[in-house]
Amino acid sequence: MHDFFLPVIKNALLSLAVSSDKPVLIERPADKKFGDFSTNIAFLIAKESRRNPKEFAGELIAHLSFPPDTIKSMTVAGPGFINFFLTPTFIMQSVEQILLEGKGYGRSCLGKGKKAIVEYVSANPTGPLTIGRGRGGVLGDCIANLLETQSYAVTREYYFNDAGRQMQILGESVRFRYLELCGVAETFPETHYQGAYIREIAESLFAGHGAALQGVHDLLPFIKSAETIIFKSIKNTLERIGIRHDSFFNEHTLYHREGSGQSANEEVIDLLREKQFIGEYDGATWFLTSRIGQEKDKVLIKSSGEPSYRLPDIAYHITKFKRGYDLMVNVFGADHIDEYPDVLEALKILGYDASRIQVAINQFVTTTVDGQSVKMSTRKGNADLLDDLVDDVGPDATRLFFIMRSKDSHLNFDIDLAKKQSKDNPVFYLHYAHARICSLLRMAALENGFDPDGSGHHLLQLLDSEPELRLGLLLLEYPQMITASIRLLEPQKMVDYLHSVAELYHKFYQECPILKAEPDISKARLFLSLATKQVLCNGFRILGISAPESM
C-alpha cells in the first residue's frame, strides 16, 4: 500500500510548496478506530518547520487527491496523524493484485543493480555446529532471503580460520587420540577438544594409514584430516535446515603475502599508521582508539605476535569493499558485541563508508524440556549440538523457533512445545492454516468445479463483512512487512505477521461460510482464501520452512 499512498502524499506536499527529506511512513494503526492506514508525515514536517501539526495535517488532507472509490474518509488524530479509511471495493481490488502477482507479491526493485553480502555461521572447523551457531545461521539465511525479494544480488558467505591456535589444538587433540589407537598411552590435556568426534576423526585416520603416522610430529596431516571431516559435517548439518553458502572465505588468505608484497593484515597496520592511529607499547601493536574518545586503546597484534580478532576483521571487510558490495550484513553472536564497533571505526578512519555495513547480533540459546534446561548432546561431547536438535524437532521447528523471538533477546528453545501437535506450537499453527486452505480448495474443485487459475477475481469486490475486510487489509501489509524486516534485520517480524494472517484466516473460516454460500460469494471467498495461501507461501519461502498441503 506504500506505493499507493506515497505519490499522492508527495504531490500534495508539492502543491503546498513544502520540501522535506523526512520519509513518508504508512502504517497500520493498532486500533482500527484510527483507520486502516495512517501516516505521521504531517507531524514530522510541522515539527521541523515549527508549524501547528493539526492545522498542517488538515491542510495536507485538503490537497490529497486519491483516485475515486478508494478512500472512504480521512481524519486527523492526536498530534497531526492522518488516518485513512479505505473503501471495501478498493481493499478487495488490492487483494486481486495479490492473485495476479502470485509468487512475485511482495517483491520490489529496491535493490536492483546492487550487490549485497550476508556473512553468517562462520564457525571455525574445530567441531560440530552448536545450537548457538544455528540460530545465527537461520537469522542470516532469512536476511539473505529477504534481501533477494528486493532484487539485491546476494552472496551468502562463510568466513573461517583454519590457521589459528585453535586449529593447532585441534590437530594435537586428534594426534593424541590417534596415538591411543596405536597403543601409545599419553595423558590427554584438559585444555584440548574432548568431544567423541575427535576420536572418530582419529579412527578415520587409523583406518586409512594404520600406525604409519605414529612417528609424524608435524601436525599438518592431523589438522587437514580433521578440517576436511569437520567441514563436511558442518555443511551437511546446515543443509539439513536449508542453509547453503555461495562462498567460503579463509581468514588465512589475509596473512598471505604475494611475492615481496604485504599481506592484507600488514597493509591495514601501515594504513592506520599513516593516519597516526597505531601505537607500539607493552610489546604489542595497538589501535589508538583513545584518539577518538574511547577509554582504552585496542590491541591489534598481541605481544606474542598473534593478531587479535580485530585486525583480520578490518582486513576482511576491506576485501568486501574491494569486491564491490553495496550492502554488507554481518550476523554475529553476542561475543562480538564489543569488537565490531572498533572494526567500523577503523574502516571510517581509512576512508570507507561504514554505513554500508549492518550488523545483526543474536543472543544466546538455551534448550528446555519440562521447563528444565537440558544439553542437546546425546551423540558427541558436552555441547549443545545443532544436529541433535534437528533430530529431535525437525528442520521446520528448528528454523522457526530460532527466529520467533527478537534476535536481541535470549532464546529459550522449548523442545516440548516444538514437538507439540497443536495450535500452541507456532509451526503447527502456521502449517495448519496453509493445509486447511489447500484442503478447502481441493473440496471446492471436487464439489463445485472451482478452478484457482480461472476467471472471477472481480467477485472479490462483493465481500464487505468485517472478517473479510480485516483479513484482506492484513494481506495488503505483506510488502511493508518485508521492508520493515529488512530495515530492522529482524525476521521475527515476518513470523509474527504470518501468525496474525493464520489467526485472521481461521476466524474468517469460522465466521464466513465458504462452500455453502451463494455461488458468487462462495467463489469470492475461495479467491480470498487463495490470496491468503499465496501470502503464507511467500512468507514461508522467506523463513525457509515447508508449506504442507495436508496434515
UniProtKB/Swiss-Prot annotation:
Cellular component, GO annotation: cytoplasm
Keyword check for Protein biosynthesis: yes
EC class name: ligase
Subcellular location: Cytoplasm
GO biological process: arginyl-tRNA aminoacylation
Source species, domain of life: Bacteria
Motif 'HIGH' region, residue range(s) on this chain: 123-133
The EC number(s) this enzyme carries: 6.1.1.19
Keyword ATP-binding among UniProt keywords: yes
Pfam families, per the entry: Arg_tRNA_synt_N, DALR_1, tRNA-synt_1d
InterPro entries: Arg-tRNA-ligase, Arg-tRNA-synth_N, Arg-tRNA-synth_N_sf, ArgRS_core, DALR_anticod-bd, Rossmann-like_a/b/a_fold, tRNAsynth_Ia_anticodon-bd
Alphabetical UniProt keywords: Aminoacyl-tRNA synthetase, ATP-binding, Cytoplasm, Ligase, Nucleotide-binding, Protein biosynthesis
Residues forming coiled coils: none
Reactions that this protein is recorded to catalyse: tRNA(Arg) + L-arginine + ATP = L-arginyl-tRNA(Arg) + AMP + diphosphate
GO molecular function annotation: arginine-tRNA ligase activity; ATP binding
HAMAP family cross-referenced by the UniProt entry: Arg_tRNA_synth (MF_00123)
Subunit and interaction comment: Monomer.
Homology family: Belongs to the class-I aminoacyl-tRNA synthetase family.
Name of the protein: Arginine--tRNA ligase
Organism the protein comes from: Chlorobium phaeobacteroides (strain DSM 266 / SMG 266 / 2430)
